[in-house]
């Protein structure tokens, strides 16, 4: 099968202390989960969190000690950012009991959400 355009490579992130990289297929996000930040954004802080996805190719890997660069529209007047706890899911599942959830976690990281 021929493609109309070339597929982008699978996004991945380095794993500290390992040669292998962790493939990123989906980025699940939780919004309005921090009350003080919700208030900064004009909400009361009592609204429930909401869930959404970001595409895996939105990922920008910045190696330790390096400075990252991210393109954004030149007329941007308020580029917002948040530090995030990243939870890398190692194994999938359904109807996972809370007591078993941690068994599905591959690892943790710090992320910068723009």
Descriptions of predicted regions:
Residues 1-16:
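Extreme N-terminal tail/first-helix region
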Residues 16-29, 33-114:
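Glycine-enriched loop-and-adjacent helix/strand subsegments that border the catalytic/binding cleft
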């Amino acid at each position: 099968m021929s493609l109309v355009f070339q597929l982008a490579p699978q996004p991945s992130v380095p794993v500290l202390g390992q040669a292998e990289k962790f493939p990123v297929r989906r980025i699940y996000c939780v919004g309005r989960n921090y009350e003080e930040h919700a208030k900064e954004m004009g909400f009361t802080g009592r609204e429930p969190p909401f869930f959404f996805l970001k595409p895996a190719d939105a990922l920008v890997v910045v190696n330790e000690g390096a400075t990252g660069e991210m393109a954004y529209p030149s007329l941007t007047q308020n580029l917002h950012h948040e530090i995030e706890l990243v939870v890398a899911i190692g194994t999938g599942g359904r109807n996972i009991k809370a007591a078993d959830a941690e068994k599905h976690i591959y690892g943790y990281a710090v992320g910068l959400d723009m």
